[in-house]
Amino acid sequence: TLADTLMRRFPDPDAYPYRSWSYPQGFMLWGFIRLYEKTGKEEYRSYVMRYCEEHVAPDGSISGFTGCSLDDIMAGSVLVWAYRQTGEEKYKKACDAVRAAFSDYPRNSDGGFWHGRHLPGEMWVDGLFMGLMFLTRYGAFVGDREACFAETVRQLNIVFARCEKDNSGLLYHGFSENPETPWASRLDGRAQEIWCEGLGWYAMILVEVLALMPRETPGYDSVLMQLQKLLASLKKVQDPLSGLWFQVVDRTRTPGNWHDTSGSAMFLYTFRKASLCGFCGDEYDEVIRKGFEGIKTKCLLDLEGNLNVYDACDGLGIQVSYDHYIHYTKNVNAKEAVAAVLWASVAMEYEGIEG
């Protein structure tokens, strides 16, 4: 129902917010890719291919792509899928062009990618998903396998080392070595809080990476360790009544905190995929069941038969305080939340998981 709603609302997938060639479009389209892989329905494949054909010229150039940020790279992961689907040389060239953006991409002193070329020294947990959804798939299916996998592990390890809170597996929203960054602690450069959706991006990329990299890949165990620590802590901070997670994840008893649909759906996807892929045992089955029930309470049909998703923010950057996170405007059908619910619902309703 959600996929059908999206195709009615956005007959052209490039019209999905927030602009042409942007990470929410890539995120949403991966939901359609998974749905196509589970159902074989051509309408879902065609929807994704329409986007790819609209953006990639015969010479492989990509309209809208600049490589200005990790966000700008994310939709390139859909082009890796298009290349695998079609074998067309233009998609290979397009993937190579996205890969080339990493050649001069700015890094901090740890070797970690800045979130954007315009954000000196800043690493956001969100950026791991944005950059590595492409980079890991390029290595797995296009080329430069060893280097792509090594870089993927390196970036995950850097952010984990810089952003983990108190050996919990939970990560603060970001880290900056730039003393001018307003949200960064003067003591250690960290953001002040653990944002639900930000942690959700990190959670999802962990299972995506583990599903794509062979077990013998150097650094695989460190990524698996991060996932297993994260799952154990997420179980502890899941709201037992609603099955959902809070906007500021670990402040479960702090006044004003509320259940974030976007991050909660991302966590549900992560738990489900981790379970299906054998990255964890059955100890999280109840977390998954309660999480799915909770997500369903945030999705309501309107009189036209369209599914609407409630209680999430649109495009939230790193904030300076707890109050800023909890008072950020909530929107119906926030672009990240809708796509996250699509990912989670497909994972819950179909046993097979793309690897």
Predicted regions and their residues:
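Oxyanion-binding "anion nests"
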Residues: W201-T252
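Long, well-ordered core segments of solenoidal/helical folds
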Residues: T1-D14, E43-S63, K93-G112, E146-Y172, ...
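His/Met- and acidic-residue-enriched segments that coordinate or traffic transition-metal cofactors
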Residues: L6-R19, D59-I62, L128-L132, F149, ...
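Carbohydrate-binding/catalytic loop surfaces
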Residues: F27-I33, L70-Y83, F113-G127, G169-I194, ...
